[in-house]
């Protein structure tokens, strides 16, 4: 699982991919502003190997009174149904905040191919902000 967003200092193919990810990230940021009045403004999307969106999620812990109602979990649930599989080796999740330890563990279990996030979470981040669960990966 890779979780580093490459900057524009790479070859043209990588810059093209980054541009696509930037468009999705901007979409997520717009959506997070809409939900920020009711929930923690975290949104996630999952792209398949062709770059098509197969799952979307927003935080719904307060609305649903659900401790598992994190954006990443919601996106995984939707994508699992659409993909009809629990393995996401070739997929990418994009989220505006580093996934917490629970969500990071779920992404590891789902064998997510790439994780792109907008900011580290120094309090609860599971991919380097607070703790790095990816260091103990067994799924490659």
Segments and roles (model prediction):
Residues 42-47:
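Short beta-strand scaffold segments in enzyme catalytic cores
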């Amino acid at each position: 699982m890779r979780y580093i967003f490459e900057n524009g200092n790479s070859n043209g193919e990588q810059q093209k991919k980054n541009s696509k990810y930037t468009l999705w990230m901007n979409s997520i940021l717009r959506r997070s502003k809409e939900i920020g009045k009711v929930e923690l403004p975290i949104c996630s999307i999952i792209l398949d190997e062709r770059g098509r969106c197969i799952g979307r999620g927003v935080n719904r812990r307060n609305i649903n009174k659900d401790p598992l109602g994190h954006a990443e979990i919601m996106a995984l649930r939707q994508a699992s149904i659409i993909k009809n599989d629990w393995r996401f080796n070739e997929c990418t999740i994009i989220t505006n905040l580093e996934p917490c330890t629970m969500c990071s563990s779920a992404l590891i279990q789902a064998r997510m191919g790439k994780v792109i996030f907008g900011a580290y979470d120094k309090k609860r981040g599971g991919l380097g902000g607070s703790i790095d669960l990816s260091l103990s990966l067994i799924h490659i």
